[in-house]
């Protein structure tokens, strides 16, 4: 689960990190009122969306008057912001953040991720703040400095000092950086984060450190024990189909193709998409119904696939282990009958109760194409999609 910038900064503040004074606003009047409350004669206004690249897309502006703030709010609120990290439709802008504007002497980078190979939280710091960290890692990896946290002891002051020295901080800034580092380390574990970034972490004209931006990803599997953070989830930033899939514990990711896929198991789902591509087709989605699929979940999965108007054919690929193929067949039959499917459906069933499942499909009277193998299924569904198109 992603947080907006203003939410990330609120969490930073809860852990004692220095952040600019700012007010999230959902209307132009609120934005103008925020400038009065914040004071000063210059403000930074930012569109709040779950995507990077806002500045280059016009979603961040330094405003020197209340009129400019109002114009920015009128321009973006209720609209969609398209960046290099969004699709062509962009993300809806429901909130803008109005912040005080200060002097920046230098931009740094500070972030943390879970390193799967070492099974530790790893902090990364760089003097190349304000840039895409992936680009820095590719072009100049020597400029990224790392510190791995021991899960038994957590973040240590000496690790902060080592990173701070490499960033060229002075004695006072080292104290501030240590406080930020220790706070982030505690927050990362306590809030079940999977990623955090402060880009840039700036040195102000007065020589102090300030978290000028914030990006936080939370482990969705841990939301059951993070009720406060779960309440911050903005579903408008997500694909409505993916939101609906989550309600049924389905793993769904929308893609740009025209062949819908329903598979049990993430590995088999990826393999299914690969073989569709291999035979000249284009998957419309990734959808894993999981090992504990029920008739109801399969029905909802089928309805979810067919809600995409681009879908011209559907491939159901089930290898029955825990999942019984006859239950999958019941779900397919129920969905086809309920939704009124008008596109070809290719079904490949193998494993637990596959014969019974195939028998149910054959006796259903529905226009379902039975496949004898995965290769046959891919060839048939690509051919069917091309015929409809």
Swiss-Prot record:
Mg(2+) binds at residues 199, 213. This is Succinate--CoA ligase [ADP-forming] subunit beta. Signal peptide: none annotated. Heterotetramer of two alpha and two beta subunits. It catalyses: succinate + ATP + CoA = succinyl-CoA + ADP + phosphate; GTP + succinate + CoA = succinyl-CoA + GDP + phosphate. Substrate binds at residues 264, 321-323. GO terms for molecular function: ATP binding; magnesium ion binding; succinate-CoA ligase (ADP-forming) activity; succinate-CoA ligase (GDP-forming) activity. The keyword Magnesium applies. GO terms for biological process: succinyl-CoA metabolic process; tricarboxylic acid cycle. GO terms for cellular component: cytosol; succinate-CoA ligase complex. Its EC number is 6.2.1.5. Pfam families: ATP-grasp_2, Ligase_CoA. HAMAP family: Succ_CoA_beta. The keyword Ligase applies. Keywords: ATP-binding, Ligase, Magnesium, Metal-binding, Nucleotide-binding, Tricarboxylic acid cycle. Belongs to the succinate/malate CoA ligase beta subunit family. Binds 1 Mg(2+) ion per subunit. Pathway: Carbohydrate metabolism; tricarboxylic acid cycle; succinate from succinyl-CoA (ligase route): step 1/1. Its cofactor is Mg(2+). Residues 9-244 form the ATP-grasp domain. ATP binds at residues 46, 53-55, 99, 102, 107.
């Amino acid at each position: 689960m992603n947080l907006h910038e203003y939410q990330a900064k609120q969490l930073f503040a809860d852990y004692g990190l220095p952040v600019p004074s700012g007010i999230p606003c959902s209307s132009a009047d609120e934005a103008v009122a925020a400038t009065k409350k914040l004071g000063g004669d210059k403000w930074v206004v930012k569109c709040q969306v779950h995507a990077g690249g806002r500045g280059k897309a016009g979603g961040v502006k330094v405003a020197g008057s209340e009129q400019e703030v109002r114009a920015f709010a009128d321009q973006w609120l209720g609209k969609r912001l398209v960046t290099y990290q969004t699709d062509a439709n962009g993300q809806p802008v429901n909130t803008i953040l109005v912040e005080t504007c200060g002097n920046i002497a230098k931009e740094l980078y500070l972030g943390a991720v879970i390193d799967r190979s070492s099974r530790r939280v790893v902090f990364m710091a760089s003097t190349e703040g304000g840039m895409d960290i992936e680009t820095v890692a590719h072009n100049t990896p020597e400029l990224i400095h790392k510190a791995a946290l021991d899960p038994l002891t957590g973040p240590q002051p000496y690790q902060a000092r080592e990173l701070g020295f490499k960033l060229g901080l002075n004695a006072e800034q080292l104290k501030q950086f240590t406080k930020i580092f220790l706070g982030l380390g505690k927050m990362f574990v306590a809030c079940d984060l999977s990623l955090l970034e402060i880009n840039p972490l700036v040195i102000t004209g007065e020589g102090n450190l300030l978290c000028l931006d914030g990006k936080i990803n939370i482990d969705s599997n841990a939301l059951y024990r993070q009720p406060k953070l779960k309440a911050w989830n903005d579903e408008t930033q997500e694909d409505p189909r993916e939101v609906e899939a989550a309600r049924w514990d389905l793993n769904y990711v929308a893609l740009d193709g025209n062949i819908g896929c329903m598979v049990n198991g993430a590995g088999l789902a990826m393999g299914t998409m690969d073989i569709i591509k291999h035979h000249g087709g284009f998957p419309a989605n990734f959808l894993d119904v999981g090992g504990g699929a029920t008739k109801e979940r399969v029905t909802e999965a089928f309805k979810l696939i067919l809600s995409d108007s681009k879908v011209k054919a559907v491939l159901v690929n089930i290898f029955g282990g825990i999942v019984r193929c006859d239950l999958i067949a019941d779900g397919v039959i129920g969905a086809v009958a309920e939704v009124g499917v008008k596109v070809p459906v290719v079904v490949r069933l193998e494993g637990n109760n596959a014969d019974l499942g195939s028998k149910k499909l054959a006796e259903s009277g529905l226009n379902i194409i039975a496949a004898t193998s995965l290769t046959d299924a891919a060839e048939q569904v690509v051919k069917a999609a091309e015929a409809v198109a």
